[in-house]
Amino acid sequence: MTTDTIVAQATAPGRGGVGIIRISGDKASDVAMAVLGHLPKTRYADYCDFKSASGQVIDQGIALFFKGPNSFTGEDVLELQGHGGQIVLDMLIKRVMEVGGIRIAKPGEFSEQAFMNDKLDLTQAEAIADLIDATSEQAAKSALQSLQGEFSKEVHELVDQVTNLRLYVEAAIDFPDEEVDFLSDGKIANALYKIIDKLDLVQASAKQGSIIREGMKVVIAGRPNAGKSSLLNALAGKESAIVTEIAGTTRDVLREHIHLDGMPLHIIDTAGLRDTTDTVEQIGIERAWNEINSADRVLFMVDGTTTAAVDPHTIWPDFVDRLPSNLGVTVIRNKADLTGEDLMMTEEQGYSVYRISAKTGLGVEELKQHLKSLMGYQSNLEGGFIARRRHLEALELAAGHLQLGKEQLEVYLAGELLAEELRMCQLALSEITGRFTSDDLLGKIFSSFCIGK
């Protein structure tokens, strides 16, 4: 943990109505005396001159002083709010540096200091960056929920429950006379099952929070001339892809980023899949499979005029066999305007099958609702929180340890091994909030922040 005094511009670079310089550390009060000539009253806005070492006025504006630990970083903090011209702000930072013992802050260092001083935990610190980077209203709302501690609260409750159960198991092992057959009396099993159920709910919420932040990647795949590019255009609401009657028109990957009621969706149109001797087309098909293998969902486009089948194993078994085993597939029977099929959804052999006309737009709205449901969309997400991929990985790791602990309890009645799995679960959960986190991870997280945050 650094004890340096740091300074940075807190507002975006460039011209603006207001520009803010933020200073945090022991020398913040020295800066106030040097630049303002006095120390402003704590937590009061003070309109004054910002002066150079020779007494010349650099700018005029509002000075705010926050005495640590009652500040964002937990240290003494001084904010100088002046005019937003970049030259003026650069002059002001240069003046602050003249005080001595002050350096320019690294990206995210103010938030890192707040984390180190227990003003917020790691999920709250990450939520600051997520709030700034939010690309939709729902993402902003969810990031604010995380900033206010909604995600942290869920994780802390889980950690407390796991810790209490672990202590009970270890105490029963150390003092066997106090609890006879403690592993088979049902108390531990019931407590463990409740924790597993609670973690399942948190995982589901975190997965949705991750989708809100990062979006779901949906790849449109199928044979040439099945209508893939027409579907991309219909979902995007604009002519993003060239559409012709010539099979193989699309030879490269096309991407569109849209929002469905605040839920970000990454739509990928790919080259038609077929055997070909055309070198350029072969490259496009290889890229298509790369996108399919990293997708969250595949929309398998079928030209409804070529087959009446609905089961993808019947339509194209080689395609289905090559798909990753855990990849979800939605079958899209296209060209319903030509086949006369009813625009409806059915479940066939575990697959959702939609009949649409990408050309006319018939059935596309129903498909959008399907995609929203896959993303876990709810009309009221006021209690939702934002989540990152590392959070999902930590929750998955914690869930794995709980399942191993459950096996040790149910199959082997191994109290010591159950206690160890609970300890590992506790560590995985605590890494989410930063209670137990490596310096490398902290550096990676905070380095992605804006300077001045």
Swiss-Prot record:
GO terms for biological process: tRNA methylation; tRNA wobble uridine modification. One of its GO terms (cellular component) is cytosol. GTP binds at residues 225-230, 244-250, 269-272, 334-337. Mg(2+) binds at residues 229, 250. PROSITE patterns: G_TRME. InterPro entries: G_TrmE (IPR031168), GTP-bd (IPR006073), GTP-bd_TrmE_N (IPR018948), GTPase_MnmE (IPR004520), MnmE_dom2 (IPR027368), MnmE_helical (IPR025867), P-loop_NTPase (IPR027417), Small_GTP-bd (IPR005225). Keywords: Cytoplasm, GTP-binding, Hydrolase, Magnesium, Metal-binding, Nucleotide-binding, Potassium, tRNA processing. It is found in: Cytoplasm. (6S)-5-formyl-5,6,7,8-tetrahydrofolate binds at residues 22, 79, 119, 453. Residues 215-376 form the TrmE-type G domain. It is an enzyme of class 3 (hydrolase). K(+) binds at residues 225, 244, 246, 249. Its EC number is 3.6.-.-. One of its GO terms (molecular function) is GTP binding. Exhibits a very high intrinsic GTPase hydrolysis rate. Involved in the addition of a carboxymethylaminomethyl (cmnm) group at the wobble position (U34) of certain tRNAs, forming tRNA-cmnm(5)s(2)U34. Belongs to the TRAFAC class TrmE-Era-EngA-EngB-Septin-like GTPase superfamily. TrmE GTPase family. Homodimer. Heterotetramer of two MnmE and two MnmG subunits. NCBIfam families: mnmE_trmE_thdF, PRK05291.1-3, small_GTP. This is tRNA modification GTPase MnmE. It comes from Shewanella baltica (strain OS185).
